[in-house]
């Protein structure tokens, strides 16, 4: 009995430590998400072609940051202001807004499971801090752009999403097309960049404007992959 308990504890510790070790290895390579793995295991279609961030139109990372995580360049993995806003909303009984940073979404997509739960958030927070510590901002964004789901039929990553929506590579996206792709996150099965409705088009226009803000312009200057230099 004691041996079984020790084995169970050891297994849990290994599972908890594995993401931290794998993060060190993910400074290079082309990792896949847990959702992609699950889809493969269930026989669902998965389409993904990895594209280095230098080969992606700068308009896409710019509008993704503008839409998903405006403080991406300045926070250390977690946007504590957004966390406090979510807590305030919960205390006031209001519907909570999404407060996850791009780094947190990378942690979730690479190592955890979809859906909302306190357990997942408890695992996600330290992972996001670790990812930000050991990987560059450019690499974090590159991972995100290549593992996010971007289409209704198993299109993962910017390349598959761009090909599905516009019939062109991620490197050829215009600012408007990039904004439409950013606007369907994180719900590519209910929103469409290929046939955008009024709401998606309105979001896209908002994100194009946000990407031109002074704060994000500073972010682009500090990160060559975003500035197109």
Curated annotation (Swiss-Prot):
Primary localisation category = membrane
Q: What's the short name of a Pfam family annotated to this entry?
A: Transgly
Q: Which family does it belong to?
A: Belongs to the glycosyltransferase 51 family.
Q: What catalytic activity is recorded?
A: [GlcNAc-(1->4)-Mur2Ac(oyl-L-Ala-gamma-D-Glu-L-Lys-D-Ala-D-Ala)](n)-di-trans,octa-cis-undecaprenyl diphosphate + beta-D-GlcNAc-(1->4)-Mur2Ac(oyl-L-Ala-gamma-D-Glu-L-Lys-D-Ala-D-Ala)-di-trans,octa-cis-undecaprenyl diphosphate = [GlcNAc-(1->4)-Mur2Ac(oyl-L-Ala-gamma-D-Glu-L-Lys-D-Ala-D-Ala)](n+1)-di-trans,octa-cis-undecaprenyl diphosphate + di-trans,octa-cis-undecaprenyl diphosphate + H(+)
* Disulfide bridge positions per record: none
User: Which Gene Ontology BP annotations are present?
Assistant: cell wall organization; peptidoglycan biosynthetic process; regulation of cell shape
Please give, as recorded in its UniProt entry, the membrane topology of this protein: Single-pass membrane protein
- By its UniProt entry, which PANTHER family does this protein fall under? BIOSYNTHETIC PEPTIDOGLYCAN TRANSGLYCOSYLASE, MONOFUNCTIONAL BIOSYNTHETIC PEPTIDOGLYCAN TRANSGLYCOSYLASE
UniProt keyword Transmembrane helix present: yes
Spell out the subcellular localization from the entry: Cell inner membrane
Per the record, the pathway is: Cell wall biogenesis; peptidoglycan biosynthesis
The UniProt keyword set, sorted, is: Cell inner membrane, Cell membrane, Cell shape, Cell wall biogenesis/degradation, Glycosyltransferase, Membrane, Peptidoglycan synthesis, Transferase, Transmembrane, Transmembrane helix
Q: Where are the transmembrane segments?
A: 7-27
Keyword check for Transmembrane helix = yes
Its biological function? Peptidoglycan polymerase that catalyzes glycan chain elongation from lipid-linked precursors.
Write out the GO cellular component annotations.
peptidoglycan-based cell wall; plasma membrane
Recorded hits in InterPro entries, A to Z, give: Glyco_trans_51 (IPR001264), Lysozyme-like_dom_sf (IPR023346), PBP_transglycosylase (IPR036950), Pep_trsgly (IPR011812)
Q: Which organism is it from?
A: Rhodopseudomonas palustris (strain BisB5)
Instruction: Cite the GO molecular-function annotations of the record.
Output: pentosyltransferase activity; peptidoglycan glycosyltransferase activity
Q: Classify the source by domain of life.
A: Bacteria
Q: What is its EC number?
A: 2.4.99.28
Protein name per Swiss-Prot or TrEMBL? Biosynthetic peptidoglycan transglycosylase
Q: Which NCBIfam families match?
A: mono_pep_trsgly (TIGR02070)
